[in-house]
Amino acid sequence: MGQKVHPSGFRVGITKKHQSQWFARFNKNKYSQTVLEDRMIRDTLNKLFPELLNPSTKGGSAPKRHQNARIKKSRITQIKIERNIVPYQIGIQIHAENCKLLKSSIKNLQVKKDILVKLQKTRQYLTNLKIKLDKLTNAPAETQVKTNFEDSTKRSVGQLELSHEGLNTKLSKIKSLRKKLAKLKTGTSTTRANTTGTRQKKLSSKTKRSISQLLKMKLLRAKLAKLVQPKLKRKALEASTIEKTTAKTLKTKKKVSLKRKNKFETKLTKRQLKRQRVFKKRLKLRKFIRLRDRLLISKGLFLQKKGHKITKKIVLAPTPKFLKDFSLNPKVYLLPVKRIEKLLTPKKAAKGGQKSAAVKTVRTSLQTNIYNSRIQKKFVTMYVEQMKKKFLPHLNELFLEYTSKGFDSNNKAVLSLGYMKQWDFERRVDNLKVQPIEKLDRLVHNLRDKFVMKLNLLRKDFITFGSFSSNSADILGLFQLYNFLMKLKNLVNGLKLNLKHKIKTRLAISKMNGSLNTSRNEPELRSRETSQASDKLRIVDSTNSSLPQKVFRKKLENISNEYRKMKFIEYLKDVVQKHRTDNIYLYLASISESRRKLKEIKNEVKQHLDLYLPGANSIKELNQKSSEDSINLATNEVNNVLMKLAKKHPFDRTFLDCKFEELERRKTMWVQNLQLVPKISIKFFSVNQKALNLKASIVSESVVDALEKRKAFRKVIKTTKENLMRNSEIKGVKIQVAGRLNGAEIARTEWVRAGRVPLQTLRANLDYSYRTANTIYGIIGVKVWIFKGFTKLVTESTGA
């Protein structure tokens, strides 16, 4: 049958269960964990959506007709999985026929109690936030139209006053009318009893009275309906019940709490009790295993992993005398002597004293080498840390020197070495003023990134050489870029303020002239300039609103969709975390990497603590007295800085702000990686009907359905092949069926092919799928290959 071999060396299975195309980026170490995870995610999603689309009712499952119709509407063609930083970010793409139906089915998903509580809290928070934002947004709209608003408010206030004053009078009227109705009812009942026997006689005076009484009752009921409106009912009930409820609240709270406990406690079945016992046994076993592992680790008998090598830890030799004084922790300098003896002893060793002498020489040489290397490493790290601390202050001093000498003026005479035309602001001012604000914003962002890159390169040079000359071209170029960036920022801010001011003045003038309230007879007096200015102002407002604010607005527009999305993502996160804990031996390398990265971030923050946090000195002073107070103060400082950053627009952020935000983002990423929690993003893609019928997965499903309905396998294969070959896009088809076909005792394989199906070529665009049909006689395997032509190769240009 043949299998493709990927150019990078990994096999891409065509005849395997998972798809022929591979979308995960992976390294050598992380290949195994990504394969298992991707396969697990695909299986869970393929099983989950049919269950969600057909939830079981109380009486039993829904009828099969409706189930089949619903599944056909929402067929999943492909599930792509993309990875950015393995195993943290997972991007899932679901290609299906009817995506809306799949999204709506997520509401039937059952989640754990802890996750559900968190989701409910977030939903409540979002609803409260939406109400507050609506109030804020409606307030300025009301102030713009003052005249209409004042009239409406006066009317509403008058109505409220009347309702509050005349509430008691209306209630008294209602009581009197109800009493009259009760009297009339008693009178009518007696008259009806008398009139039952004498139906054939003429209407007496009593019966005439009864009719008049009924008419009166109708009129009274109509009056009551007018008086007793739903709003008045509510107000009356509120007024009467406030005093009663306040008195009873304290008494009822205790009773309700006791009742709730008894109400929600349900009796467990035998099966549930058995499960509980099993879980308890498992917990005991796990605790015992943990204790045993800890004891093994403490004794040094546990397996130890160093990089890619796994070795057993052997009892180590004691430390030499000269190393004990060097460090407080002597365990660091223990040497694996027994293992070295086995490796370095010669094959034909001499007897007695010669062997021991050889081992002693090896020991002494190793000890001296390790001692020297450790000292060198320590001094190198100290030197690097000192140079990193010196870099920024040294650069600031140089920049101040340049400004004092007049390098800021961008003269060619002054900047003979590092002069660059592109960073000359005075030459480009006239051209920049004409450009739109959006374009200028992008330019600022790009220049900032360029500045950061150059600064990092300079830092590396400074660490290696120890200093840099004041007349170097790189530093002068960086200084020129910095000045250009600062001036450009000021220019853009000035342009935005001018635009706002112009539009406000024009709007005020138009209100005075009455040009805003245009009618059919009066044409709109709006010039081209004002329309352009208003459009520009919209752009300015959109840029001023920061990115988190935009995200929040989108979320608040449709809370139900957001809740559904969060529910699905949290469910998948829980599934992946459970899978990772079960197969933790595959994630040992990623855990160690995340720990190393967190240490690096910690050291970086320690070095530049004065720059990142304004209250760093107070934290250091507190740390000497009490560690707990210093930790609390540090957390508060970090939270304050992050809050300020969130409020700031990206355009107004400094280099240090961007750096601090980046560090915080990296920290959260590596912490979640330690906890084996992934970051999942889901996208749904709708597939056209034409493209859907040409997918191998759907063709195989149709063959499986036909076989399960006891149709003849040869006819099914032939018809599917003919239907596919009618399409011009398809170049070749191959369908294979294997098992007890038509209930035969001996299993066999049958296959049909039309056109070309090259399985051995890498350039071939092949779509493959494998499904199993569960029949009465057993399982029948179905394989489908669809060839859609060759992919285009990048040909090298044949030039001179």
Curated annotation (Swiss-Prot):
Q: State the residue spans of region: S3-like 2nd part.
A: 665-800
Which PROSITE patterns would you find in this protein's record? RIBOSOMAL_S3
Its annotated compartments are: Plastid, Chloroplast
Would the keyword Chloroplast be found if you checked this record's keyword annotation?
Answer: yes
- Keywords carried by this UniProt record: Chloroplast, Plastid, Ribonucleoprotein, Ribosomal protein
Major subcellular site: plastid
Q: Which domain of life is it from?
A: Eukaryota
Q: Where is this region: Intervening sequence (IVS)?
A: 119-664
CDD domains in the record, alphabetically? Answer: KH-II_30S_S3
GO biological process terms held by the UniProt record: translation
Q: Which InterPro entries match?
A: KH_dom-like_a/b, KH_sf_prok-type, Ribosomal_S3_C_sf, Ribosomal_uS3_bac-typ, Ribosomal_uS3_C, Ribosomal_uS3_CS
The record's Gene Ontology cellular component field reads: chloroplast; cytosolic small ribosomal subunit
The UniProt entry, under PANTHER family, shows: 30S/40S RIBOSOMAL PROTEIN S3 (PTHR11760), SMALL RIBOSOMAL SUBUNIT PROTEIN US3C (PTHR11760:SF19)
Know the name of this protein? Small ribosomal subunit protein uS3c
- Species assigned in the record: Chlamydomonas moewusii (Chlamydomonas eugametos)
